[in-house]
C-alpha cells in the first residue's frame, strides 16, 4: 500500500511538523517548485515523508546553480546515478524508517522527515542572514550539507563528495557572486 502525502494546506500544516506555511511561503519560486517535485518523488518512491535525499535529488536535477557548487560535471553525474538507485538499492533500507538525527522530536505522520523539516528552516535562516526574504537552492544545499546526520550527507559521502570542502565553498557564497570554486 502506498501512502499519500498530504496536499491541502490544512493537512500539510497539521501533519508535517515544523515546516509549515510560514517557511514554505519564504521560498523562492524556483525552490517552491523544487519542493513540490521532491514531494512527488517521495510519493512515487512509496515514502511517507520527504527526506533530505529527496531534496538533494531534486535540487541536483533542477537547479543549475546548485550543480555549479560541485567540483565537476562527472561528480554531479555520479551523484545523480547514485540517487536514482534509491528504489532498487541503498534506499530500500530507508523505507518504513524515519530520517531522524535525534536532535529533534520524531514526527510519525506523513509530510517531512524531522531532519528535512529542520533543514528547510535552516535554509530560510541562511537566506535571512544574507538579507534575502526567500531561500533558494544554494541555501537549501548549504543547509543539507551542514546536517551531518542527514541521508543527503550519507549519499554525498558515498558518491565521493568531500562534504567539508563543499560546505566551505557554500559558506563563501553570496547573492549574485555564485559559488566559489577551488583553484585548479
Residues of each region from the PLM?
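Histone-fold recognition with a strong bias for associated Lys/Arg-rich disordered tails
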Residues: 1-184
Amino acid at each position: 500500500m502506498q501512502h499519500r502525502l498530504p496536499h491541502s494546506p490544512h493537512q500539510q500544516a497539521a501533519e508535517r511538523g515544523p515546516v509549515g506555511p510560514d517557511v514554505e511561503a519564504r521560498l523562492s519560486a524556483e525552490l517552491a517548485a523544487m519542493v513540490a517535485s521532491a514531494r512527488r518523488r517521495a510519493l512515487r518512491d512509496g515514502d511517507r515523508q520527504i527526506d533530505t535525499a529527496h531534496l538533494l535529488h531534486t535540487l541536483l536535477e533542477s537547479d543549475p546553480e546548485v550543480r555549479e557548487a560541485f567540483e565537476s560535471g562527472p561528480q554531479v553525474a555520479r551523484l545523480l546515478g547514485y540517487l536514482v538507485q534509491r528504489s532498487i538499492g541503498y534506499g530500500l533500507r530507508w523505507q518504513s524508517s524515519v530520517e531522524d538525527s535525534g536532535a529533534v522530536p520524531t514526527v510519525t505522520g506523513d509530510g517531512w522527515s524531522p531532519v528535512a523539516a529542520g533543514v528547510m528552516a535552516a535554509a530560510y535562516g541562511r537566506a535571512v542572514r544574507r538579507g534575502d526574504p526567500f531561500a533558494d537552492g544554494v541555501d537549501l544545499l548549504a543547509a543539507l550539507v551542514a546536517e551531518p546526520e542527514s541521508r543527503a550527507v550519507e549519499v554525498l559521502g558515498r558518491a565521493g563528495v568531500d562534504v567539508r570542502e563543499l560546505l566551505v565553498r557554500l559558506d563563501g557564497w553570496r547573492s549574485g557572486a555564485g559559488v566559489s570554486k577551488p583553484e585548479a
